[in-house]
Amino acid sequence: MPTVQSTCWVFTLNFKGEIPILPFNERVQYACWQHERVGHDHLQGFIQMKAQQSLGQMKAIIPGAHFEKMRALNSDQAKAYAMKEDTRIEGPWEYGKYIKKGSHKRKIMERFEDDPEEMKIEDPSLYRRCLSRKMTEEQRSTAEWNYDMKPWQDQVIQEIEETPDYRKIIWVYGPKGGEGKSTFARYLSLKQGWGYLPGGPTHDMLHIISGEPKNNWVFDIPRVASEYVNYGVLEQVKNRVMVNTKYEPIVIRDDNHPVHVIVFANCMPDFTKISEDRMKIVHC
């Protein structure tokens, strides 16, 4: 039988004499409890964990307590039941910070803002994701174009102002370097609903893209990687069926939402690897 796990639990702890002190640890996000007397003295409570825990793990937090996985429709109801007045003798008491349903993402960023160094030690992967989001939002809020627009840049803007379709890939070609391709690519990618990639292996690129599958995408190909342009990824993004095989294989379908794809490169497309009719070439 699979082990029962949950982030939300209710508990009862019988006692005699003085009210016991509950030894909550850093795994507990929030707890509320009160002294009740229905035939005998006991503590009735609700606990919200930071991550899913098994029954055995919960019993280790409060030895001797009877635990059950939350059965209420939501955590608000379970919390209210644990603090009901009709059977209360003393309390209620609270520990930690309660996270309402639907607010998890906001609370994670609040934790990051409150103490990024603690998160860096506790969960380095989560810290890096929060840092990435924060830095992107900061750059996006201050992004400005302080240069005169070149004709090819005007042409790109005209192309992306049109409604995207399922085929056209905008390919910005500048063989010499110094035309402003990368500067313009970075600027475009800071627009809301846009993402940036420098190319790379299929599984890495699609893992990143699957995090924001509805984005328009800018691919800024370094000169050193010009002969390794990943045409398969470009087509998957345009076709709106994306297969991410990294860590956990998933298929993302977004058939009714075409997006723009722009490639900035020092080379022309290799038409042995992609259909010529897909390409809208913009010369720098």
UniProtKB/Swiss-Prot annotation:
ATP binds at G174, P175, K176, G177, G178, E179, G180, K181, S182. It catalyses: ATP + H2O = ADP + phosphate + H(+). InterPro entries: CRESS_DNA_REP, Helicase_SF3_ssDNA/RNA_vir. A motif (RCR-3) lies at residues 81-84. A motif (Nuclear localization signal) lies at residues 51-71, 98-104. Keywords: ATP-binding, Covalent protein-DNA linkage, DNA replication, DNA-binding, Endonuclease, Helicase, Host nucleus, Hydrolase, Metal-binding, Multifunctional enzyme, Nuclease, Nucleotide-binding, Nucleotidyltransferase, Transferase. Residues 3-98 form the CRESS-DNA virus Rep endonuclease domain. A motif (RCR-1) lies at residues 10-13. Transmembrane segments: none annotated. The keyword Cell wall biogenesis/degradation does not apply. A divalent metal cation binds at E36, H42, D86. Pfam families: RNA_helicase, Viral_Rep. Its cofactor is Mg(2+); Mn(2+). One of its GO terms (cellular component) is host cell nucleus. Divalent metal cations, possibly Mg(2+) or Mn(2+). It is found in: Host nucleus. The active site is at Y81. A motif (RCR-2) lies at residues 42-44. GO terms for biological process: DNA replication. Homooligomer (Potential). Rep binds to repeated DNA motifs (iterons). There are 3 rolling circle replication (RCR) motifs. RCR-2 is probably involved in metal coordination. RCR-3 is required for phosphodiester bond cleavage for initiation of RCR. Initiates and terminates the replication only of its own subviral DNA molecule. The closed circular ssDNA genome is first converted to a superhelical dsDNA. Rep binds a specific hairpin at the genome origin of replication. Introduces an endonucleolytic nick within the intergenic region of the genome, thereby initiating the rolling circle replication (RCR). Following cleavage, binds covalently to the 5'-phosphate of DNA as a tyrosyl ester. The cleavage gives rise to a free 3'-OH that serves as a primer for the cellular DNA polymerase. The genome of nanoviruses is composed of six to eight segments. In addition, some isolates contain subviral DNAs. Belongs to the nanoviridea/circoviridae replication-associated protein family. This is Para-Rep C3. It comes from Milk vetch dwarf C3 alphasatellite.
